[in-house]
């Protein structure tokens, strides 16, 4: 038995030394140390030896051989793994002196650029930027803004109701009411602009979308007049479209302002002489404005006998389309990088 054990040891150590990869080492672990290995079979015959001393001696020799084979396997496996790692590192070597690949820098979406520009203009004039929720209650979106039950603007064909009393806001005017009630709480002056997304039940085409943006402004104080409204709108228009642009206010109707006016700017394409864009009028419509209706002031916690205010609203999409000659509002949301990278 001793000769068998020593022969197995020598054979195993020689095979381990000649192993070419880690896979071969794993196979040898099973071959030389597994339950069905030749070594296990030889040691299984210890009980047939004639004396206790022989059984002890052969058992001790068998354990020494197991330990020697295990140590040899572990050492060779570590050696082969290290060699494989070095070979992989050599094959995947990276030249760290090469210049890095350029990374394309991101930039703000064109609408965000326009909205930020509008915010900068009004912040420089002493206004705050106020924002509010896009899912709104009927009262803040309609009732508080002098749009009672039965008004056409409440029609399900125009508004996106989520339930009987909750809808996606149709304008950012809800922010004005919430600011008056939750922030200002009767104090004056109030000078805010309210940018944000709004939603209408509309058919999408080159000039209409179900989701678009608005920027509204609100000023409340004693002695506020249409003259100061026109002054603020003139400053805004000239900051956006150039120092030579003019504005005019045309009588109109909005339920939350009285009197109400549409705001036009002199055509930036023909200088007011008349062209296809302005349809020969020399003027381009931008948005709506007017003096805050007394009912809206009351809903916001103000006494219309003590203070007055004005408000305006227009769409950043409309401004961007005029500034950059964009003809289709859908370009803003189609996520076409060929379009977006131009700005």
From Swiss-Prot:
Binds 2 magnesium ions per tetramer. Its cofactor is Mg(2+). One of its GO terms (molecular function) is transferase activity. It comes from the Bacteria. Pfam families: Phe_tRNA-synt_N, tRNA-synt_2d. GO terms for cellular component: cytoplasm. Mg(2+) binds at residue 258. It catalyses: tRNA(Phe) + L-phenylalanine + ATP = L-phenylalanyl-tRNA(Phe) + AMP + diphosphate + H(+). GO terms for biological process: phenylalanyl-tRNA aminoacylation. It is found in: Cytoplasm. PROSITE patterns: AA_TRNA_LIGASE_II. Belongs to the class-II aminoacyl-tRNA synthetase family. Phe-tRNA synthetase alpha subunit type 1 subfamily. This is Phenylalanine--tRNA ligase alpha subunit. It comes from Symbiobacterium thermophilum (strain DSM 24528 / JCM 14929 / IAM 14863 / T). The lineage of its organism: Bacteria, Bacillati, Bacillota, Clostridia, Eubacteriales. The gene is pheS.
């Amino acid at each position: 038995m001793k000769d068998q054990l020593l022969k197995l040891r020598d054979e195993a150590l020689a095979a381990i030394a000649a192993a070419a990869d880690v896979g071969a080492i794993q196979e040898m672990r099973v071959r030389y140390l597994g339950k069905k290995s030749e070594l296990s079979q030889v040691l299984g015959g210890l009980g047939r030896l004639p004396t206790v001393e022989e059984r002890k001696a052969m058992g001790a020799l068998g354990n020494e051989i197991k330990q020697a084979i295990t140590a040899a396997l572990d050492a060779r496996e570590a050696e082969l793994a290290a060699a494989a790692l070095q070979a992989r590192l050599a094959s995947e070597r990276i030249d760290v002196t090469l210049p890095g690949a350029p990374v394309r820098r991101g930039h703000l979406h064109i609408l965000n650029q326009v909205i930020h520009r509008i915010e900068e203009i009004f912040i420089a004039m002493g206004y705050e930027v106020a924002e509010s929720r896009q899912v709104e209650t009927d009262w803040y979106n309609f009732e508080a803004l002098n749009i009672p039950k039965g008004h056409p603007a409440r029609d399900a064909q125009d508004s996106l109701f989520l339930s009987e009393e909750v809808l996606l806001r149709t304008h950012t005017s809800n922010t004005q009411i919430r600011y008056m009630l939750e922030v200002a709480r009767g104090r004056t002056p109030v000078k805010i602009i309210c940018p944000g997304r709004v939603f209408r039940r509309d058919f999408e085409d080159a000039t209409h979308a179900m989701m678009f943006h608005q920027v509204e402004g609100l000023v409340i104080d004693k002695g506020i007049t249409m003259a100061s409204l026109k002054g603020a709108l003139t400053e805004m228009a000239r900051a956006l479209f150039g120092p030579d642009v003019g504005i005019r206010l045309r009588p109109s109707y909005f339920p939350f302002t009285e009197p109400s006016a549409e705001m036009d700017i002199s055509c930036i394409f023909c200088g007011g002489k008349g062209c296809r864009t302005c349809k020969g009028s020399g003027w381009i419509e931008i948005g709506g404005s007017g003096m805050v209706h007394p009912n809206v002031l009351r809903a916001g916690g103000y006494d219309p006998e003590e203070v007055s205010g004005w408000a305006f609203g227009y769409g950043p999409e409309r401004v961007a389309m005029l500034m950059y000659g964009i003809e289709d509002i859908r370009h803003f949301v189609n996520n076409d990088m060929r379009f977006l990278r131009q700005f």
